[in-house]
Amino acid sequence: MGEKDIIRDLYEVILDRRQKQPDGSYTAYLFEQGEDKILKKIGEEAAEVLIAAKNGGGAALVGEMADLVYHLLVLLAWHGLAPEDVLAELAARRQKKS
């Protein structure tokens, strides 16, 4: 699995966990708890990103950003959206500025 495909690969795992709801799966737990729990986790992870950045960044910042991206992907799945939807929006915005 290359770095280029990691977002898509992770998103596919999220979708699989949502569908199959395996015991002990954190992702399945988030879907079971619902949107409010997912949003709460995004808020917590965003705050942790800010703290890691203020504390000098580095590996801690990378780790917290990875946690935030994961939870954002869960939210996309909750709403029936895909990472490509966000990428398409970013590309469209870039085209407008060029």
Curated annotation (Swiss-Prot):
GO terms for biological process: L-histidine biosynthetic process. It comes from Pelotomaculum thermopropionicum (strain DSM 13744 / JCM 10971 / SI). It comes from the Bacteria. CDD domains: NTP-PPase_HisIE_like. The keyword ATP-binding applies. Keywords: Amino-acid biosynthesis, ATP-binding, Cytoplasm, Histidine biosynthesis, Hydrolase, Nucleotide-binding. InterPro entries: HisE (IPR008179), PRib-ATP_PPHydrolase-like (IPR021130). Signal peptide: none annotated. GO terms for cellular component: cytoplasm. This is Phosphoribosyl-ATP pyrophosphatase. The lineage of its organism: Bacteria, Bacillati, Bacillota, Clostridia, Eubacteriales. Disulfide bonds: none annotated. GO terms for molecular function: ATP binding; phosphoribosyl-ATP diphosphatase activity. It is an enzyme of class 3 (hydrolase). Pathway: Amino-acid biosynthesis; L-histidine biosynthesis; L-histidine from 5-phospho-alpha-D-ribose 1-diphosphate: step 2/9. Belongs to the PRA-PH family.
